[in-house]
Amino acid sequence: MKKIFLLTTAFVSLVTVLSAQYKYEFTVVKENPATAVKNQARTGTCWCFATISFLESELLRMGKGEHDLSEMYIVRHNYNRRIADNYLRRGKGNVNPGSLSHMCTYAVKHFGLIPEEAYPGINYDSPTHNHTELSNYVKLLSAEAVKNKKRIPAELQEGLFDAFLGKVPETFVYQGKEYTPQSFAASLGLNMDDYVEITSFSHHPFYEQIILEVPDNWDFGKHYNVPLDDMMAIIDNAIEKGYTVAWDGDISEPSYDFNKNSIALNCKDTIKNRELKNRVKELPVTQESRQADFENFTTVDDHLEHITGIAKDQEGVKYYITKNSWGLGRNGTGYHNMSENYVKAKTIGIMVHKNSIPKEIRAKLKIK
């Protein structure tokens, strides 16, 4: 009986060891205010959700209060711009949904803003956004326009967006006042010229504005190119000074796990949707390794999110607290933590307020 008891105890202990799970535990170092997590759902509009979230945090930082701004108003204007661009490029443009942060700030500067309650952008039978049909129609009409050598008639193009997103109100009432999109944007006090995009790739000269060669940069917007250490210093300084960061990067890695572990690590291990038995060893990152991954297409322009803070794990490793636009259903919070090495390796670009850039770097970039 004693032998059976000992064997049973040993078996239970073995099962316990085998089933043990390593859990990353985080302590917040600095977290800046952000609005509620939203859900882009079945759309390729992460660029807009991330940048609007970033601008909403800017309003909180500026003491302007909490506002829920309409992403679909911006998306609509972005589609109109890229349809025109594609036509003049004889069909060689990009009419897919993806874009970058500066396309959002361009739309705000030229077309204004609308609160979500005045333009939710869902004019079809769905509780969440779904642009599957809309995207197909945009591609079809764009191709026909090029084929016929004639732009899409304005009433047809606007009718398409009215059908899916709803008609844009000329005026609306918000918090007891009547606005147009332009007057509402002006009332918020945001200056789109204050926001700049930063990247770090060595095939371009540093401390100059460059055109980043990614498909979503269809309007050839410019990024300031800096060494990797400077880019990370900009992110850290922004968070420390109370700003947040719009982040564009690669999430196609098996080491990016939003759902189960809510963590992104720079490693070769597959951690996506898996229980972690041990702490994962990360790979170091250099300017050269980062460049190599960009040029062999390992690092690609996948997704935009919103960095709102910094945390450290139980071993003292730094992470960036990151707000996604996939709703709350996947992991309960809508946030996850990306390690410093992951951000070093997988960042395509960032958008920040120019005042959040360290003075010495800003001087080298000649940003006034």
Tell what function each PLM region has.
Residues 1-23:
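Bacterial Sec-dependent N-terminal signal peptides
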Residues 21-32:
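N-terminal regions that are enriched for targeting/export leaders
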Residues 32-44, 88-95, 218-225, 234-235, ...:
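Second-shell loop/turn segments in exported
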Residues 42, 47-51, 55, 100-109, ...:
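Stable alpha-helical elements in mature extracytoplasmic
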Residues 43-75:
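N-terminal, post-signal-peptide region of Sec/Tat-exported proteins
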Residues 48, 73-76, 104-106, 115-118, ...:
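Structural recognition of the beta-strand scaffold that forms the well-ordered cores
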Residues 71-175:
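Papain-like cysteine protease catalytic cores
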Residues 158-368:
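Active-site signature of cysteine proteases
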